[in-house]
Amino acid sequence: MFKMVSSPHTHGTNLTAKFMLWVIVAMLPALIVQIAFFGTGVVIQLAIALSMAIVIEIVVAKLRHKSTTFYLADLAGVVTATILAMAIPPYAPYWVVMIGMIVALLLAKHCYGGLGQNLFNPAMVAYAFLLISFPVQMTSWLPSFELLAEPPTFKDAWLLIFKGVTSDGFTSRQLLSGIDGIAQATPLDSAKTSIAKLGFDGVIQSPIFSGIFARGWLQLNLAFLAGGLFLLYKRIIHWQIPVAMLVVFSVLSALTDLVTMHTHLNVLSQLFSGAMMFGAFFIATDPVSASITPKGKLIFGGLIGLLAYLIRYYGSYPDAIAFAVLLANLCVPLIDHYTQPRLYGTHK
């Protein structure tokens, strides 16, 4: 028997796998930029993450008596693996991304019932778990390669990830020993801990900054921005979430900068020195864990911008995107409940 469904009975060509494939394509420019400025470690992390995704999806399919490729065909696991691999430090130990993929796919996705059922963004659940559980490994970012006397080769990247040392016996921390002014994980970390003493002008004179922008991070964020605009053009994502998120964050940051007189990085530095563009276009726009109503998307995006601002400026973690997205995910059922569009023909 056929299941009765309401009309119109039209076939949509935009399958889940097609949407996911466009997201992957949109992340390729940022992946290339990350390799160029931060090395080939991200390629190895991505390979590990993809391998784990394939294994986990096959195991879960078998446990649920599905076909082997049942959970692989939609490419959702591939997108999660790509986001997580690009979010963690390129030279983090191999077991970090392996644990992260287990948390992302098993705990944050399949324990909720699989694709379309999860309350939280799986990649951000894994990232937050890793950051809390392994803070040293998750803050082991190397600066842009132009600051390193001997940038790690692919062989060195492999050895750093699997053995913790390069072919010359250097750890990732030792690779920084010849660079003055670098004592923290990322430009946002460095600025947060030193701006009170050095001031804004002193911070941007650090080697990790080129003008008001962090070396490598500006190009990476521009690549994510380009990919996000491509997704908007292809109508894979909606404009409300990234626009609301960036506008709210920018306005609050600008007002704070006016009031506190350069005790924080300025708005442009904040937008292009961390994961803001990555979060706005590729993380916050997750179609499952984000709001689904037009007004709800604006509220959801604005809430992420507000939370990211509060955590960055007044919290202990300088980037804040993961925690802001997860906290906003908690509010999605409430947001959707109160922002349902009025049915045609009904009274306001």
Swiss-Prot record:
Q: Does the keyword Cytoplasm apply?
A: no
| Superkingdom of the source species | Bacteria
UniProt keyword list = Cell inner membrane, Cell membrane, Electron transport, Flavoprotein, FMN, Membrane, Phosphoprotein, Translocase, Transmembrane, Transmembrane helix, Transport
Do you know which Pfam families this protein is assigned to?
A: NQR2_RnfD_RnfE
Whether Repeat counts among this entry's keywords is no
Please cite one Gene Ontology biological process associated with this protein: transmembrane transport
Its chief place of residence is membrane
Listed EC numbers: 7.-.-.-
Q: What does this protein do?
A: Part of a membrane-bound complex that couples electron transfer with translocation of ions across the membrane.
- HAMAP family reported for this sequence: RsxD_RnfD
Its name, as the record gives it, is Ion-translocating oxidoreductase complex subunit D
Task: Recall the taxonomic lineage recorded for the source organism.
Answer: Bacteria, Pseudomonadati, Pseudomonadota, Gammaproteobacteria, Pasteurellales
Which gene name does the record give?
rnfD
